[in-house]
Each structure stands twice: as structure tokens, then as C-alpha cells.
Amino acid sequence: MGNNLMQTDLSVWGMYQHADIVVKCVMIGLILASVVTWAIFFSKSVEFFNQKRRLKREQQLLAEARSLNQANDIAADFGSKSLSLHLLNEAQNELELSEGSDDNEGIKERTSFRLERRVAAVGRQMGRGNGYLATIGAISPFVGLFGTVWGIMNSFIGIAQTQTTNLAVVAPGIAEALLATAIGLVAAIPAVVIYNVFARQIGGFKAMLGDVAAQVLLLQSRDLDLEASAAAHPVRVTQKLRAG
């Protein structure tokens, strides 16, 4: 019995070669899912790193602006893909659409709404790929378990056909079946961990972008208040002259 076990190839590749076609398909599917997981990890990691570094630099530059026009001048060098520039454009577009309106509070509310929608849209865009990670992390263990159950069923069928409980006959089939579960866990565990890491990073990035949006809204609010004060100042001067 020991010689038969030694002659049986129990390496990972050997178990795969001797596995049933259904178990092979399960293993291949899980390996492809693992490849997708790591591809998403590397691509999104680079994207997060670049976007966060760029947004942090833009936020520092915009902190020096004292008006919306000055912020637009600073953002002119950010490039067309700049998220900060998009937020500034939202505020500027609302000012242009609301030209002639004396309701400054309404302008601020509409601008705030547009900025919130823009931040939410960026968050959804940054979260692309996380759905695949969640799906892989959730179903991979069960897919691997299906392969294990199928492989053990075939092992029992082999025992019935050979009418022997010799370990040399039973062990390879069971080992092949358990390999499917192992591959399922290898695919699922990194997917769940990476999903949670990205979820935290997306939340942090949205918070940083929200700070930029608040900075843009602050500049617009200051401009509107200063314009309103400048328009009201001549009236107060005229009233004083008449009283005198």
C-alpha cells in the first residue's frame, strides 16, 4: 500500500491532471478569479496612489486662493482630468446659470448640491471593480466546496467499482477534491481583504475630495457676500448724505 501511495503523484499539478473534468473546470475558474483579483488590486492601487497624490497637491495650491477667479487661474495648470478643476467648473457654471439672481443663498444651495453629486460620481467611479472583488470573495469558497463534493462523490464511486477500501485507491481522489476547496480559499481570502482595503481608501479619498468641494463653496460664498456688500454700500452712503 505504501508503494502504491508513493507511485501516485500527489503534487498539485499531478492532482490536477488526475482530477475529474468537472473538478478541473472548478479549479480553472477559481484560478481565473484569483488572477482577476490581483489584476484589480494592482491597477486600482496605482490609480488610488496617483489620484490621491495629485488631489493633495491641488488642495494645497487651492488653499492659497482668495476668490473663485483666483482659484480658476490656479487650476488652469491642473489639466483637463483634474477633479479639482471639475469642481470649480461646477461652481462657475452655476454662477453663470444664476446670473441676474439676487438670491445668493439659493445659488449656494444649488452649487452645494452640484458639488455633492460630483463627489458621489467620483466615488462610484473609483469603486469600479470592487463589485467583482465582493462577488469573488463571496462565492469562491462555495465553488471550491462544490468541486470537493463532486470529487469525493467520484472517489466513492471508484471505491464501489473497485470494491476496495485501500488507501492507495481512496486517498488520491479525496486529495484532488480537497484541492478544489484550497484553491477556493486562496481566491476568496485575498479578494475579501483587498475589497475592505479599497473600501476604506475610497472613503478616505471621497473625504479629501469633499474638503476640496467645501473649499470651492467657501470661495464662491465669499465672492457672493463681498459682491452683495459692495452693491449695498453706495445705498448706505446715499442714505447718510440725505440724513445730513
Protein language model regions, located:
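Hydrophobic alpha-helical transmembrane segments of polytopic membrane proteins
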Residues: 177-191
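Residue-level signature of catalytic and energy-coupling elements of molecular machines
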Residues: 20, 38, 71, 88, ...
